[in-house]
Amino acid sequence: MGKPPSRHPEERGGEADKPRRTTALSSFEGDLRSPPQGDGGQTRCGFIALIGAPNAGKSTLTNALVGSKVTIVSRKVQTTRALVRGIAIAGAAQLVLIDTPGIFAPRRRLDRAMVTTAWGSAHDADIVVLLIDANKGVDEEADAILAKLGEVRQPKVLVLNKIDIVDKPALLTLAQKLNAEATFDATFMLSAATGSGVEDLKRWLAEHSPAGPWHYPEDQISDAPMRSLAAEITREKLFNRLHQELPYQATVETDVWKELRDGSARIEQTIYVERESQRKIVLGKSGATIKAIGAEARKEIAALTEQA
C-alpha cells in the first residue's frame, strides 16, 4: 500500500452566488409539467453514448447539446473519468447524453477500467455517436475504435468535429474514408466549440430516439449533484493551469456547500494529489496558484448556479 494522497484544502470560505431557486442539477422541486407532445402526442427519450479518442471533443459537444456546462473541458487527456450524463431537450424528445472517457490503448488498470466503461456505455445506449477529431484524421486510436465499432449493434452516427480548422475538401475525403471503413446511419460535420452544425445533430438524435416517457424533469440538465459539478469545475481549472505538471489522477471533493443568509454560498473543497511535490506545485509561490485556481472556479460556479 502506498502513502495516502497529500491533501490541501482549496481556499476555505470561497463564496458563490446562491441559486435563484432550489433546483440542483440532480433534483427538482416544484410542480412537474408534462413534457411537450410531438406528432401524434408522443414523447421520445433516447440515451446517447458519445465515444471517441481522448480530446476528440466529447465533453465540449455534450455541453453544446445541453446548452449549459455539465462536464469539464481540458486539453489534458482523460479528464472525463466516469460517465457524465447531460440532459438536452429537443421538442418532444429528451436526450440523455453520456459523455464517456476517451478510448485508447490502456496500460494501467484505471485506464483499462475507463475504456471498458466507455464501450459498455456504447452497448447500453439507444444511439452511439462516434466523434472524430477532423484535424487529426484517422490515426491509430481512431483505427482501433473503428475496428471494434462493428460489435456495437445500435444505430451509429459519425461526427467529424473541429471543422472550423479543417478545409472542406479534406473533410469530404475523411468522411468518405470513414464511411468506407464502418457503417454509419448518418454523418455530421460540426464544430462543438463554435456551435456550428450542432443543432442539426441534435435534431437528428431527437427524431431517431425511441418513443417513450422522459426519464428526468424538464428543467434538469444533468444527473450530477451541484456539489459534484462544482468539484469538477475546480478540477478543470486545476488542469488548465497545471496541464503539464499534474497527473490526471488529481481529484477534487466538495466537503461543504452551505447557503448563507446573505444569499451567497460557502463552498469548501479539498484537492487530492499523489505526492508532496505535487502539493507544492498546486500551492504555488506564496499560495498564488491555489488562489488563482480558487478565483477562477468561484467565478464559474457562481455563474452556473445563477442560471440553474
How would you name each of these model-derived features?
Residues 57, 197, 289:
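Conserved glycine(s) of the Walker
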Residues 155, 164-222:
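Canonical P-loop GTPase G-domain recognition
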Residues 92, 116-187, 258-261:
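Conserved C-terminal guanine-recognition region of P-loop GTPase G domains, centered on the G4
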Residues 68, 87-91, 121-128, 152, ...:
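Conserved, well-folded catalytic cores of nucleic-acid-processing
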